[in-house]
């Protein structure tokens, strides 16, 4: 193993920052260069805990350790060392350094200056330890978000001494030391034309072409080249080719996730690598229980980017383990998990219950982007979770200024879609109105229209903004560069206009011009009306024929002059007798049967969606007698006779005055 001699007269350095590192030494076994001489070690170098010392640093000798969020770098189950600044006492060569203790001490530092001062007290170190020190600098500095080290640090003698050995003779370096140093210096320096990086890259390329790199080194090299040259780097194909030839049993969980990230860098090539992906997807099922929250999030993200819809068993298993560790996810990681579950269309009761507890416990500290993603997840899956909705409403009322226009829309829209008013509804919509009054022009036109339309679904009518959205100026903005307005926007405008007539008679502002009004609210995306459940309709139709005597006495899928489509319409004369549907004279009352299948309700509930509740409310205001026939009542009927009795009770109760 190559030893690196360091100059000991290094300058003291101030803290500095970089953008984060990606991975570290994992697979190559590193032997101690010399035995530890315990009696010569400084007292503070020893653990205060009995048992073997385990170091939470990505290093070949310490395979059980990983940094789960980039900030949590203490050994598993043990507290981190307190900071000690008596650096002059540590004047020993590597023969007095126990490797595990070296990494334990290294991981206790929180700034680059401390790391460099610590390493400067050592006369010689193995190349893997030196590379580990560089990597640790990446770990401690990436939390501040800067992408590069300051110039004064890069040019300092301390940093140059640390880098000098790697550039002088890279051929003497171990594989693990080489690729880890290359990775760390790429992140710290970032200049592809750097003489040092060019030397290290050339040596990596040489060993790659000889087939001399192990799995973990290939993974680190691949991610480093993507960082340095972008996903179009030609060498990446050779790395993936060599990884395909390795047995998956030799891959660690971190390696598997890194392979996903390598493939994710070129999603357009996913079809070419599908056989390899299928193998990885299947093998990953056995690794899920060993993944950290960070790795789970990264794996799910890669599955989305690579469009691995056939890997649903893996997605389901990952979601089960997310439930167990949800409190350990960062906001960004949990957001990625939710995006993946939305993409694959997966949800389950246990995840929802755990998410409810998590969101409720963090009510006023939730990240705005995470809040909007949680609400989008509930909206897409039609999950009406009162604990989540109440917590989110409270968060918005207290911290509305933190939410962007798009985040605000994603937060509010599910309340209308799922037909739910939180306990603090008045405060919620007052806060929203104030935001719109002050930031109206910051909302994109379509986002604003969706937001206001959602409010109207739960009878929080945006009267103060109707004049603006019906104005020619707004309609022109809404259309943008297109030659016409899309059908969904026109339908939303039309329903808002109908709402202004039926529910806001005091509104006296501009009307929506006829050319912007649709004839039917049925749209391809079913955003304003849900099509009738055909199988449920067939059952009800049989019962109606038995009850009324003939198919002649009711019509189905009737488009009204008010844009709504009625599932079944029955006409009654003044005496309450049923008329044939072909007769339009002497019609005294129209009965609208709403045959509500499961898709018209929130998931696993009897709570109507906002669009369906609005439709029934409007039909009543238009003079229809609305009769709801929900699927869960039909499913309880055991015979045709029970169905007829049920329909008779619904249609011709004592108060309805109807006859047949």
From Swiss-Prot:
Pfam name, any one: FAST_2
GO molecular function: RNA binding
Domain RAP: 591-649
Protein name in the entry: FAST kinase domain-containing protein 3, mitochondrial
Gene that produces this protein: FASTKD3
Keyword set, alphabetical order: Mitochondrion, Transit peptide
Comment block on domains: RAP domain is required for FASTKD3 function in mRNA stability and translation.
Transit peptide range per the UniProt entry: 1-57
The keyword Oxidoreductase appears for this protein: no
Family membership noted in the UniProt record: Belongs to the FAST kinase family.
Subcellular location per the Swiss-Prot or TrEMBL entry: Mitochondrion
Tagged with keyword Mitochondrion: yes
A single GO cellular-component term on record: mitochondrial matrix
PROSITE patterns in the record: RAP
Function (record text): Required for normal mitochondrial respiration. Increases steady-state levels and half-lives of a subset of mature mitochondrial mRNAs MT-ND2, MT-ND3, MT-CYTB, MT-CO2, and MT-ATP8/6. Promotes MT-CO1 mRNA translation and increases mitochondrial complex IV assembly and activity.
One of the protein's GO biological processes: regulation of mitochondrial mRNA stability
């Amino acid at each position: 193993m190559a030893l690196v001699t360091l100059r000991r007269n290094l300058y003291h350095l101030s803290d500095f920052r970089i953008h984060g590192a990606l991975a570290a030494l994992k697979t190559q076994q590193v032997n101690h260069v010399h035995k530890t001489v315990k009696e010569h070690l400084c007292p503070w170098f020893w653990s205060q805990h009995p048992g073997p010392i385990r170091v939470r640093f990505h290093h070949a000798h310490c395979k059980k350790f990983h940094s789960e969020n980039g900030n949590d770098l203490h050994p598993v189950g043990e507290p981190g060392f307190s900071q000690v600044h008596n650096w002059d006492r540590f004047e020993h060569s590597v023969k007095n350094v126990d490797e595990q203790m070296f990494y334990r001490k290294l991981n206790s530092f929180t700034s680059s200056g401390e790391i460099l001062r610590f390493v400067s007290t050592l006369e010689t170190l193995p190349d893997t330890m030196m590379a580990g020190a560089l990597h640790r600098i990446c770990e401690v500095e990436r939390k501040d978000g800067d992408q590069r080290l300051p110039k004064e640090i890069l040019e300092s003698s301390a940093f140059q001494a640390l880098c000098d050995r790697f550039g002088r003779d890279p051929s003497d370096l171990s594989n693990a030391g080489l690729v880890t140093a290359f990775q760390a210096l790429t992140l710290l320096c970032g200049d592809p034309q750097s003489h040092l990086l060019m030397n290290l890259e050339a040596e990596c390329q040489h060993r790659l072409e000889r087939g001399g790199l192990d799995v973990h080194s290939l993974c680190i090299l691949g991610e480093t080249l993507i960082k340095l040259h972008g996903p179009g780097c030609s060498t990446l194909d050779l790395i993936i080719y060599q990884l395909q030839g390795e047995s998956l049993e030799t891959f660690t969980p971190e390696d598997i996730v890194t392979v996903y990230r390598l493939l994710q860098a070129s999603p357009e090539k996913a079809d070419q690598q599908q056989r390899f992906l299928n193998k990885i997807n299947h093998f990953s099922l056995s690794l899920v229980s060993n993944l950290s929250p960070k790795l789970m999030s990264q794996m799910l993200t890669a599955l989305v980017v690579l469009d691995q819809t056939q890997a649903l068993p893996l997605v389901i298993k990952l979601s089960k383990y997310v439930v167990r560790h949800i409190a350990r996810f960062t906001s960004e990681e949990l957001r990625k998990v939710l995006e993946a579950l939305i993409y694959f269309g997966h949800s389950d009761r246990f995840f929802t219950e755990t998410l409810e507890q998590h969101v409720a416990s963090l009510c006023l500290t939730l990240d705005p982007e995470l809040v909007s993603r949680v609400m989008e997840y509930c909206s897409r899956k039609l999950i009406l979770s009162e604990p989540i909705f109440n917590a989110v409403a409270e968060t918005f009322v207290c911290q509305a200024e933190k939410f962007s226009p798009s985040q605000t829309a994603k937060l509010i829209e599910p309340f209308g879609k799922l037909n739910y008013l939180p306990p603090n509804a008045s405060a919620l919509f007052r806060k929203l109105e104030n935001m719109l009054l002050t930031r109206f022009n910051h909302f994109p036109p379509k986002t604003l229209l969706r937001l206001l339309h959602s409010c109207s679904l739960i009878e929080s009518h945006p009267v103060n903004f109707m004049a603006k959205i019906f104005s020619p100026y707004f309609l022109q903005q809404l259309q943008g560069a297109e030659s016409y307005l899309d059908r969904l926007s026109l339908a939303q405008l039309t329903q808002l206009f109908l709402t202004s007539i039926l529910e806001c008679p005091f509104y006296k502002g501009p009307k929506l011009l006829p050319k912007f009004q649709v004839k039917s609210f049925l749209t391809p995306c079913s955003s304003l009306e849900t099509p009738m459940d055909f199988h449920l309709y067939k059952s009800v139709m049989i019962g109606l024929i038995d009850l009324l005597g003939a198919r002649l006495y009711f019509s189905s899928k009737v488009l009204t002059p008010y844009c709504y489509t009625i599932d079944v319409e029955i006409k009654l004369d003044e005496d309450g007798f049923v008329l044939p549907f072909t007769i339009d004279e002497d019609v005294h009352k129209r009965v609208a049967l709403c045959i509500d299948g499961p898709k018209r309700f929130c998931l696993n509930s009897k709570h109507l969606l906002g669009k369906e509740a609005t439709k029934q409310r409007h039909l009543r205001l238009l003079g229809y007698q609305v009769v709801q026939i929900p699927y869960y009542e039909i499913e309880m009927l055991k015979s045709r006779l029970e169905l007829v009795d049920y329909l008779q009770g619904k249609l011709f109760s004592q108060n309805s005055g109807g006859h047949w």
